[in-house]
Amino acid sequence: MKIALFIAAFIGVASLLAQDAALPAPPDTVGVPYYLDSAASQLKKLPTEPYKKHDPVPGVITVTQTVNIKGSASAFRVPAENKIVFVYDATTMPRLYKFTVNGSNRKFSYGKVSVRGSTPIEGLPISVSRYKDTAYQISADQPLAPGEYAIVLADRIFTFGVDGK
């Protein structure tokens, strides 16, 4: 019985180590998310795009803060999967937003401002876990539907699109 437990534990540890060895090395760039292409065992750098913030002056009413990016779609495309994973090395917690596409522009809301102050809009729920060494991986808590998305790290916005199956 003890031998069977030892063998089962050894196989479990060996399979975990083998999975970790199959993963690509962590990124060498801080503050930039990478798409984990598990089929190719590669990390692919997400592009950043110029954006325009709309920060209205607080008044009597509550106003929404938005980010606008020109172009109806990101050039970086990923296939729809149950779990889309991104890897990053940064001290800032990333946020994930889904764009609303209107013609040749993409937009998402990130906060609400009123005379009483501002309230952030958190974006889509994500899970963060250790990747390798000092890197982390993030994934949405729910599968991402086809569409346009942004990962916000500090004051930089990285874009990607999810294509249908």
Q: How would you label these PLM feature ranges?
A:
Residues 3-13:
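Sec-dependent N-terminal signal peptides
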Residues 14-18:
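Sec/Tat signal peptide C-region and signal peptidase I cleavage site
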Residues 19-110, 155-165:
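Primarily secretory-pathway and cell-envelope proteins
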Residues 92-95, 126, 147:
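Short beta-strand/loop motifs in extracellular/secreted proteins, especially
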Residues 110-133:
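Extended, solvent-exposed segments with strong compositional bias
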Residues 127, 137-139, 159-161:
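Generic structural detector for well-ordered beta-strands
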Residues 130-131, 147-148, 152-163:
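C-terminal partner/receptor-binding element of secreted or periplasmic proteins
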Residues 134, 140, 144-148:
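A glycine-anchored, Pro-Gly-centered beta-turn/N-cap motif
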